[in-house]
Each structure stands twice: as structure tokens, then as C-alpha cells.
Regions:
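Short, charged, surface-exposed loops that flank catalytic or proteolytic processing sites
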Residues: 10-16, 82-92
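Short, small-residue alpha-helix embedded
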Residues: 63-87
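Single conserved hydrophobic/aromatic residue that forms the stacking wall/gate
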Residues: 1-12
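Conserved phosphate-donor
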Residues: 17-58, 62-63, 108
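Gly/Ser/Thr-rich beta-alpha loop segments that engage phosphate groups in nucleotides
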Residues: 9, 37-38, 70-72, 76, ...
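Charged C-terminal helix
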Residues: 88-128
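Active-site-adjacent loop and "lid" segments of alpha/beta metabolic enzymes
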Residues: 38, 83, 121
Length: 128
């Protein structure tokens, strides 16, 4: 077993950074590599561009309801960036939004369910 929980987390982190750097060398302006599929207590997402390396660290959420996190994250980052946030701030806010969506997932079905895309909407009490 070569999972990060066995002490190889730094190896995976270096591989993620090398992969991001390769994409930058191919012409990408900004790269965010998600670390959510690695088995560890902490999720590390790697952001890289020509002038910044940023590692976003969050506690792993113990749930099987994470379907749609990648698409949701890219949409959230795009939204925050288009509203004038810096790319790093947009990534930070997007990751926080997805974490909140994971924490408030509706727990549908028995398999891997969706996250709660409406987590940031406050619904009036009379409509609940």
C-alpha cells in the first residue's frame, strides 16, 4: 500500500507539483490539482502558476456523498474569478464552497450521492 497514510504523502505531493508544472510548461496559465482521491486525513489541493505555488489544506470529510465535487469546484472558481477575485482567492473560496456543500450533503440513496449545491442559500423559515 503506497497511500499517503503510509508515510508517502510527500511523494504524492511532489508528483502533483511536477504534474502541475508540466501543464504550465505546456502553456496553461493556472493549474489546480485536487488531492481529494488520495487516502489521507488531510486533503491537499495544489495550485501553481508561473509566480505562485499554493497548497490548500482541509480536513477530509468522512462521507461517500461527494459526487460532483470536481465540476462544482471548477464552476465555483470560475464564478468567483469572474466576480473580480484573484485566481488564488477564487480557488480558496471555491474550495470552501465545495467543503460546505460536502458537509451539508442531502444523503440521498445508498451509493455515492451528490453534494448540496444549495448550501449557501438561506431559505425562509416559512418555506422549509
Amino acid at each position: 500500500d503506497s497511500s499517503p497514510s503510509r508515510g508517502l504523502g510527500d511523494v504524492y505531493k511532489r508528483q502533483m507539483i511536477l504534474a502541475a508544472n508540466h501543464l504550465i510548461n505546456l502553456g496553461a496559465k493556472n493549474v489546480l490539482i485536487k488531492g481529494g482521491h488520495l487516502q489521507s486525513k488531510t486533503v491537499e489541493d495544489i495550485f501553481l502558476n508561473k509566480s505562485n505555488l499554493k497548497i490548500f489544506r482541509n480536513l477530509r470529510r468522512n462521507t461517500k456523498n461527494t459526487h460532483g465535487t470536481g465540476c462544482t469546484l471548477s464552476s465555483a472558481i470560475t464564478t468567483f474569478f469572474s466576480c473580480g477575485k484573484s485566481i488564488i482567492k477564487a480557488c480558496d473560496k471555491g474550495i470552501k464552497y465545495v467543503n460546505s456543500a460536502i458537509l451539508t450533503n442531502p444523503k440521498y440513496g445508498k451509493g455515492h450521492g451528490p453534494i448540496n449545491h444549495l448550501n449557501s442559500i438561506k431559505i425562509e423559515k416559512r418555506y422549509r
